[in-house]
A protein has these predicted regions:
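N-terminal auxiliary segments of SAM/dcSAM-dependent transferases
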Residues: 1-61
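Conserved SAM-binding loop and adjacent beta-strand
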Residues: 70-84
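Helix-to-beta-strand junctions that scaffold the AdoMet/dcAdoMet cofactor pocket
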Residues: 93, 116-117, 144, 185-187
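Conserved class I S-adenosyl-L-methionine
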Residues: 93-104
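Conserved SAM-binding loop of SAM-dependent methyltransferases across substrates and taxa
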Residues: 105-118
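Short beta-strand element of Class I
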Residues: 118-123, 191
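S-adenosyl-L-methionine
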Residues: 125-174
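C-terminal substrate-binding/active-site "lid" region of AdoMet-derived donor-dependent transferases
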Residues: 175-245
Length: 255
C-alpha cells in the first residue's frame, strides 16, 4: 500500500523515536528528524526505510499509541495502560455506543472512537467550553470527529441516552453520576470510573452498592518495560506506576 496525499504517517527511527506527519505537501522542521518535505513521501510504500540526514527512518501507518503521543494536552490524560483496561473490561467493540463523562484533552475519546468506528459512537459530556474547544482540535487532527458527539453539559445533572453499552467517567465526583449511569445503561452494560484518589473510589463503590450493579471491582495497572540486549535482560529502572484507580461494575435488573 502506498502513501497518498493527506495521509497521516508515523516516522520511527532505529532507537524508537517517533513523530506523526500529515502528508500535506508542506516542508517542516521536526525535532530529532530535521527538515522534512512531506510531499516526498507520496507514492512510497508503507513500511519503506528512508534516510533522513544520517539516520534510518521507517514510514508506517500510525497506531493508537502514536496518535496518543501526538495529542496536545490541556488536562491530565488517561494513559494507554488504563485505556486498554477500560476497553477490555467494558467490552467496548466496533458498533458500541459509549457515554463519556469528562472529555479533558480528548485522549481517551480518541482511542474509544477508533474502537467503536464505523457504526458506533462516543457521546461525551463536558461542562467546560475551553476543554471542548481544545479536545475538538485534537480529535480533528487525528480524524475521528465523525464518531464523536460532544454535549456541553454537566453529566452530574443527567444523561439523555438510553440502552448504551458503557458509561466511562473521568470526573472528580463520579458517585454523583451512578444513578444516571444505571438509567442510561442497557441490561448487562458496564460502567468504568477513573479516579486518582482512593477516597474517590470508596465513595463511588458505596454508591454502586446502593443500586442494581454487580461485579464491582477496582484495579490499578502498573507498567514496566523490559530492556533486552545481547549481554542480558533486565527490567527498566523506570516504571509507569500509579496514575489512577479503575472501578468497574455491570448493570442488572435487581440485587
Amino acid at each position: 500500500m502506498t502513501i497518498e496525499r493527506d495521509d497521516i504517517v508515523v516516522l520511527i527511527d532505529e532507537k524508537g523515536k517517533r513523530c506523526m506527519v500529515n502528508v500535506d505537501g508542506k516542508t517542516r522542521k521536526i525535532k530529532g528528524f530535521g527538515v522534512i518535505n512531506s510531499q516526498e513521501f507520496v507514492g512510497l510504500e508503507y513500511g519503506k526505510k528512508i534516510v533522513l540526514g544520517t539516520k534510518n527512518v521507517w514510514l508506517l501507518r500510525p497506531f493508537s499509541y502514536d496518535r496518543w503521543g501526538s495529542l496536545k494536552r490541556k488536562a491530565q490524560i488517561i494513559l494507554p495502560k488504563d485505556a486498554a483496561q477500560i476497553i477490555v473490561n467494558c467490552s467496548i467493540v466496533s458498533g458500541s455506543i459509549v457515554v463519556e463523562g469528562g472529555i479533558g484533552s480528548g485522549s481517551l475519546t480518541t482511542v474509544l472512537s477508533q474502537i467503536v468506528a464505523p457504526d458506533g459512537k462516543i457521546i461525551s459530556y463536558e461542562k467546560r467550553r475551553d476543554f471542548i474547544d481544545f479536545a475538538m482540535k485534537n480529535l480533528r487532527n487525528v480524524r475521528v470527529l465523525d464518531y464523536v458527539e460532544i454535549k456541553e453539559r454537566d453529566i452530574t445533572k443527567g444523561i439523555d441516552e438510553k440502552d448504551v453499552d458503557a458509561v466511562v467517567l473521568d470526573i472528580p465526583d463520579p458517585w454523583n453520576v451512578i444513578e444516571h449511569a444505571w438509567n442510561a445503561l442497557k441490561i448487562g452494560g458496564s460502567i468504568a470510573c477513573y479516579s486518582p484518589l482512593i477516597s474517590q473510589v470508596e465513595r463511588t463503590v458505596n454508591e454502586l452498592r446502593k443500586l442494581p450493579f454487580i461485579d464491582i471491582r477496582t484495579i490499578e495497572t502498573l507498567q514496566r518495560e523490559m530492556i533486552v540486549s545481547k549481554h542480558g535482560t533486565r527490567p527498566s529502572f523506570d516504571m509507569l506506576g500509579h496514575t489512577g484507580y479503575l472501578t468497574f461494575a455491570r448493570k442488572v435488573l435487581e440485587i
